[in-house]
């Protein structure tokens, strides 16, 4: 069986496969594969995590498994997922491992791998690790064990890398920024980057206790940030998710600037416009229309940053992302990076001498409603004839005026129901109707 989903291995801590025992075996299996494919006798892996309490246990287990397989480990501590991708390359490691469940609740956790290039691990290597997991764990001769060391300057290295993506002749001296860290991996480095570039920073949700990650805060819950920006009289707000690979922003009036807005800014307002942009099937139709008017290419990929990355590489483009705030700028970073994405928007603000709301003044999203239907067990909505009939009826109703999208989450038992169209009330009603239909059929199935 394959343990890897669309974004590594993920689940509830204490239940397979997110257990200390499995993490030990996974570390050993990955270590054996890396030893076979590494030009070095003892390959190096960098290992980082977000702020979940369970991350410390999984870190110890993974580290032990890797060392037992003869792999050296550099422990980075709590850092954003893109920081681990960067440090994998910067420290010339053979691979990077992140312990995180991103925007999920604290009781979930996950494990994913980066290649030596700081990109998602190729499917072929994941399959090799799967095969190795079926074998028994055995300890190498003591002389062949690996060892672990803690990297004490990991935060500083990453902060400097982020700052290097912001033009050296620009500064943020005149800006007041509220930064929502989601009690997550960017709780320290996030505010530091913007402060060191000159901004006056108000940091929110930057006191992780291992259990409060993403709890009514961060990019998935921006309401308190929207309120705080107005209360503090700030120029803008920035919200990360738990592992800081997603970002949403807020203008000075408290309006939300999501991933579609950010792509619009980078594609149409920047001094150097990209040849094309990759969105996803979730990207608002307004983005597609706006980019067409600006003579910027646009293609849709499946949901998931690995598919956006794949489409970018196929088209030879560098800019892409999702409405949720996964933004890729491949000329700056190998993976989605919330801090770097925010810095690219700030770069446009400085070079255009415009406020955030001015950059999106001419960009209006079509009404779109997304309903997440959480299930006890995952099901395929298109395998149920009654649901297919409902979907077809909705598509016919919106023909030429909008669209629907029904898809399964790749990381949790959730069916996402998205409806988009030119009439807001119709869109809301239709989305709730379809979500209720999914709930009803799930109870019957």
Swiss-Prot record:
Keywords: Isomerase, Magnesium, Metal-binding, Phosphoprotein. Its cofactor is Mg(2+). NCBIfam families: glmM, PRK10887.1. InterPro entries: A-D-PHexomutase_a/b/a-I, A-D-PHexomutase_a/b/a-I/II/III, A-D-PHexomutase_a/b/a-II, A-D-PHexomutase_a/b/a-III, A-D-PHexomutase_C, A-D-PHexomutase_C_sf, A-D-PHexomutase_CS, Alpha-D-phosphohexomutase_SF. It comes from the Bacteria. The keyword Lipoprotein does not apply. The gene is glmM. Activated by phosphorylation. It is an enzyme of class 5 (isomerase). Binds 1 Mg(2+) ion per subunit. This is Phosphoglucosamine mutase. Gene3D superfamilies: Alpha-D-Glucose-1,6-Bisphosphate, subunit A, domain 3, Alpha-D-phosphohexomutase, C-terminal domain.
């Amino acid at each position: 069986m394959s343990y890897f989903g669309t974004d590594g291995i993920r689940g509830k801590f204490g239940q397979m496969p997110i257990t200390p025992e499995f993490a030990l075996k996974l570390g050993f299996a990955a270590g054996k594969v890396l030893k076979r494919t590494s030009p070095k006798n003892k390959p190096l892996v960098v290992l980082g995590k977000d702020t979940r309490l369970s991350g410390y246990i999984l870190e110890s287990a993974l580290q032990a498994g890797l060392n037992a397989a003869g792999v050296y480990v550099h422990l980075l501590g709590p850092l954003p997922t893109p920081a681990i991708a960067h440090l994998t390359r910067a420290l010339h490691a053979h691979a990077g491992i992140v312990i995180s469940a991103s925007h999920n609740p604290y009781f979930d956790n996950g494990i994913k791998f980066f290649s030596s290039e700081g990109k998602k691990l190729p499917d072929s290597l994941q399959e090799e690790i799967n095969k190795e997991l079926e074998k028994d764990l055995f300890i190498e001769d003591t002389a062949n064990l690996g060892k672990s060391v803690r990297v004490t300057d990991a935060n500083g290295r990453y902060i400097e890398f982020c700052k290097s993506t912001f033009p050296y002749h620009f500064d943020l001296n005149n800006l007041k920024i509220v930064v929502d860290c989601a009690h997550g991996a960017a709780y320290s480095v996030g505010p530091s980057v913007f402060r060191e570039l000159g901004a006056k920073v108000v940091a929110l949700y930057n006191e992780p206790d291992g259990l409060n990650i993403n709890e009514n805060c961060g990019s998935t819950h921006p309401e308190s940030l929207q309120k705080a920006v107005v209360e503090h009289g700030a120029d803008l707000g920035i919200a990360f998710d738990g592992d800081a690979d997603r970002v949403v922003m807020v203008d000075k009036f408290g309006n939300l600037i999501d991933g579609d807005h950010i792509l619009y800014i980078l594609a149409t307002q920047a001094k150097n416009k990209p040849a094309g942009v990759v969105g996803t099937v979730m990207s608002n139709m307004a983005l597609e229309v706006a980019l067409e008017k600006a003579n910027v290419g646009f293609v849709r990929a499946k949901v998931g940053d690995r598919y956006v990355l794949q489409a970018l590489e196929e088209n030879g483009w560098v800019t892409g992302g999702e409405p949720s705030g996964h933004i890729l700028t491949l000329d700056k970073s190998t993976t989605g990076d919330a801090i770097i994405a925010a810095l690219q928007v700030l770069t446009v603000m400085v070079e255009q001498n415009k406020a955030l709301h001015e950059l999106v003044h001419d960009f209006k999203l079509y009404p779109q409603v997304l309903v997440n239907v959480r299930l006890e067990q995952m099901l395929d909505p298109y395998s149920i004839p009654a649901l297919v009939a409902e979907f077809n009826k909705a598509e016919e109703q919106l023909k030429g005026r909008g669209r629907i999208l029904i898809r399964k989450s790749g990381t949790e038992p959730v069916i996402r129901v998205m409806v988009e169209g030119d009439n807001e009330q119709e869109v809301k009603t239709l989305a709730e109707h379809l979500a209720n239909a999914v709930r009803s059929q799930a109870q019957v199935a």
